[in-house]
Regions:
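Alpha-helical transmembrane segments and their short interhelical loops
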Residues: 113-190, 236-260
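Short amphipathic alpha-helical coupling elements at transmembrane boundaries
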Residues: 17, 21-25, 91-98, 104-108, ...
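Transmembrane helix-boundary elements of multi-pass transport/secretion proteins
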Residues: 25-97, 128, 147-158, 208, ...
């Protein structure tokens, strides 16, 4: 009896080849991929447990209060997913595009520009997911030690939520990188990333801001990611999470479309 092998659709098969290529490149230095994982982890221990011991409980939007570490942990998970996606779609993507001329060679094969964009987003999403898995692994170990940071049985939803965050920043980061001309232009990207990390409800509720500033913060992608993951880990689920999901998926998809068009202009003109 001949077994049937179901091949993935072409729209996924070709981008997967690019993911396989990246895996081969990193096979001897795989720990480099985890370089950005440690920053949010250090913040968790220093801010969540260190400063948290001085602060006490923090109010949530639904009237409940949780320990400061429980408040901060989901925000740092969102930041970890963001870091993994941004690291891969900024400097690494720029090097392959401008200096290694990797994509000039790839588009000489049956792969299209859309395949290139999808493949790099898939790879960035994989890196962001690895960061999230590592972070959640540490959270799990802390739970075994009696330092539980997830207060809801729905906390497992934090991982797929972090994956959506990674997708949003992968698409947006790669689209932004197609407009970068020189290495120093990445300083402008950091001017967006660092304030988002500090002020998007990561370390304290945005109720501390004036109403106009709160509205502005709510428009940022990291706030949407923080709000989504925090709702999963604390059990504060409501209809506003659909807005978070729609926002993040739309951002990633629009970024992917812009990247495909920009690659056409950069590589074919």
């Amino acid at each position: 009896m001949v077994g049937l092998r179901i091949a993935p659709p072409l729209a996924l098969r070709r981008p997967t080849r690019l993911v396989q290529r990246n895996l081969l490149v990193y096979r001897r230095s795989f720990m480099v991929i985890f370089s950005g994982f440690f920053e949010p982890l250090f913040y968790l221990f220093s801010m969540g447990f260190g400063v948290g011991a001085l602060i006490g409980d923090v109010p949530l939007g639904d009237g409940r209060s949780v320990p400061y570490a429980v408040f901060v942990a989901p925000a740092l998970l969102a930041s970890s997913a963001m870091n993994g996606a941004i690291y891969e779609t900024s400097n690494n993507f720029f090097y392959k595009l401008k200096y290694a001329k990797l994509y000039d060679a790839i588009i000489a094969t049956p792969m299209s520009l859309q395949d290139v964009a999808r493949g790099e987003v898939m790879w960035a999403l994989m890196r962001g997911s690895l960061y999230s898995i590592g972070f959640l692994g540490v959270v799990g170990l802390l739970a075994l030690a009696g330092l539980g940071l997830i207060s809801s049985p729905l906390g497992w939803l934090a991982f797929p939520a972090a994956t959506v965050v990674g997708y949003a920043f992968a698409g947006a980061g790669m689209a932004a990188t197609t407009f970068v001309r020189k290495w120093r232009d990445f300083d402008f990207m950091q001017l967006a990333i660092m304030p988002m990390f500090l002020f998007s409800g990561t370390f304290y509720p945005i109720d501390a801001y004036p109403a106009a500033v709160q509205t502005f913060v709510q428009l940022t992608p990291l706030y949407r990611g923080v709000h989504l993951i925090r709702a999963c880990t604390t059990g504060s689920l409501d209809a506003t999470l659909l807005i978070d999901l729609a926002y993040l998926v739309a951002l990633g998809t629009i970024g992917l479309a812009i990247t495909s068009r920009r690659l056409g202009k950069l590589l074919l003109s």
